[in-house]
């Protein structure tokens, strides 16, 4: 029958969506002829659009189907990055009407009971995942880890305090440059001269005796360098940017004064920044600290001082729930180790056709940079991989080559397909 003002389109979760009545016969309108099919009728010709529901499931990291009629790619992007398909499907099912509330999460008041239940559960699940002690606060903020490069010294230092930095890549270097505006900085080790391919021996670090804290980037996304253990500050406390390996493995939170990171690599979409901070470190911000960078303001207001990134926090909550359902971070780490071993072994077994410049002992489980012996073939490698539905393999513009980011949500099947492609490519071009 033709759609009228009393007609409804029925979604895959039986949600009724009112169909609009055209203002005149010259405008396009809708006919519902077959189940799940919408005919767009105009003066020219009808166009039928078939809406296909899918029950795609991912078991043991392997896809059992595709969403709708459009097969998904394997997305190796460094961030924003691939998200778990079951999380996306949950969000899709609730997008129009969240749990019978009559509204989308994107429409909720951040001070309403519905969103309060979302953010409180997200924090609770994250605390369970990382076994966060009660003497730590969890903040859901905005601005990315880059904003925290300023927020950290503003909240934790006086202008004449010194902060030590171990710089193992581009992000650690950026953190130093920003901190210089608000405190004294001392780079006690930098891997820049060796093109950021290693982590130093902690015994050789000459720390500043009265340093307020020691800052590291736990996993350098661009260069693929990851701390497998952490230095112990002689004075002060340890602060870590964990943007690209957050929730990829268990972490002893009590070893840190602050852990922070952007969500868009491992635990959600872009727009959410998570800060885990020891409570006794809150409340000492410099007078010049903007209100939106003051940890005390956000802590006292439970991350609701202003409108937070509501939908992003909701998505993070779904990811935390998913990680718990997988068995927690010990199980997640096992899966990540298996994927990384598969890819690194393929590189090592290529007899130099593929090369990873990073020292083996500190190679990242999350970001795998590699180059070709014949660099002139790299563009073709990226192009041909895209044809096989493996995308975002181009290395960061500052280093070139290729990079495969294999975060939690990258299924084993994606890495297996990439390794098979690498072997075929080598056979054709060796």
UniProtKB/Swiss-Prot annotation:
Its cofactor is pyridoxal 5'-phosphate. Pathway: Amino-acid biosynthesis; L-serine biosynthesis; L-serine from 3-phospho-D-glycerate: step 2/3; Cofactor biosynthesis; pyridoxine 5'-phosphate biosynthesis; pyridoxine 5'-phosphate from D-erythrose 4-phosphate: step 3/5. Inhibited by high concentration of cysteine and by 3-phosphonooxypyruvate. Not inhibited by serine, threonine, valine, glycine, tryptophan and O-acetyl-L-serine. Pyridoxal 5'-phosphate binds at residues 145-146, 171, 221, 241, 264, 306-307. Keywords: Acetylation, Amino-acid biosynthesis, Aminotransferase, Chloroplast, Plastid, Pyridoxal phosphate, Serine biosynthesis, Transferase, Transit peptide. Belongs to the class-V pyridoxal-phosphate-dependent aminotransferase family. SerC subfamily. Involved in the plastidial phosphorylated pathway of serine biosynthesis (PPSB). Catalyzes the reversible conversion of 3-phosphohydroxypyruvate to phosphoserine. This is Phosphoserine aminotransferase 1, chloroplastic. It comes from Arabidopsis thaliana.
């Amino acid at each position: 029958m033709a759609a009228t003002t009393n007609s409804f389109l029925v979604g895959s979760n039986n949600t009724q969506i009112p169909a609009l009545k055209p203002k005149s016969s010259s405008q396009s309108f809708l006919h519902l002829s077959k189940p799940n099919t919408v005919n767009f009728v105009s003066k020219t010709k009808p166009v039928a659009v078939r809406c296909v529901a899918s029950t795609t499931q991912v078991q043991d990291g392997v896809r059992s189907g595709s969403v709708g009629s459009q097969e998904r790619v394997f997305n190796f992007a460094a961030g924003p990055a691939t998200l778990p398909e079951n999380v996306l499907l949950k969000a899709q099912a609730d997008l129009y009407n969240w749990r019978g509330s009559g509204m989308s999460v994107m429409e909720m008041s951040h001070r309403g009971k519905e969103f309060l239940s979302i953010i409180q559960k997200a924090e609770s699940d994250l605390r369970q995942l990382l076994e966060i002690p009660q003497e730590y606060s969890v903040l859901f903020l905005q601005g990315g880890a880059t904003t925290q490069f300023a927020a950290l010294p503003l909240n934790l230092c006086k202008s004449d305090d010194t902060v030590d930095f171990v710089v193992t890549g581009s992000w650690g270097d950026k953190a130093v440059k920003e901190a210089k505006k608000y405190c004294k900085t001392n780079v006690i080790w930098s891997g820049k001269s060796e093109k950021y391919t290693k982590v130093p021996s902690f015994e050789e670090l000459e720390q500043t005796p009265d340093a307020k804290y020691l800052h590291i980037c736990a996993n350098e996304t661009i260069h693929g360098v990851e701390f497998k253990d952490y230095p112990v500050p002689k004075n002060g406390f340890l602060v870590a940017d964990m943007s690209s390996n957050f929730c990829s493995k268990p972490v002893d939170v009590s070893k840190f004064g602050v852990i922070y990171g952007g969500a868009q690599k491992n635990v959600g979409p872009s727009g959410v920044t998570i800060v885990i901070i020891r409570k006794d470190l809150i409340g000492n911000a410099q007078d010049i600290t903007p209100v939106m960078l003051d940890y005390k303001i956000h802590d006292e207001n439970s991350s609701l001082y202003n409108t937070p990134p509501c939908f992003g926090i909701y998505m993070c909550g779904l990811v935390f729930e998913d990680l718990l359902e997988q068995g927690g971070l010990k199980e997640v780490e096992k899966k990540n180790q298996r994927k990384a071993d598969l890819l690194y072994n393929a590189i090592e077994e290529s007899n130099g056709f593929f090369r990873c410049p990073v020292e083996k002992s500190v190679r990242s489980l999350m970001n795998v940079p590699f180059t070709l012996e014949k660099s002139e073939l790299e563009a073709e490698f990226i192009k041909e991989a895209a044809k096989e539905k493996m995308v975002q393999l181009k290395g960061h513009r500052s280093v070139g080559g290729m990079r495969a980011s294999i975060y939690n949500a990258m299924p084993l099947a994606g890495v297996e397909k990439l390794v098979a492609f690498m072997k075929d490519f080598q056979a054709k071009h060796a």
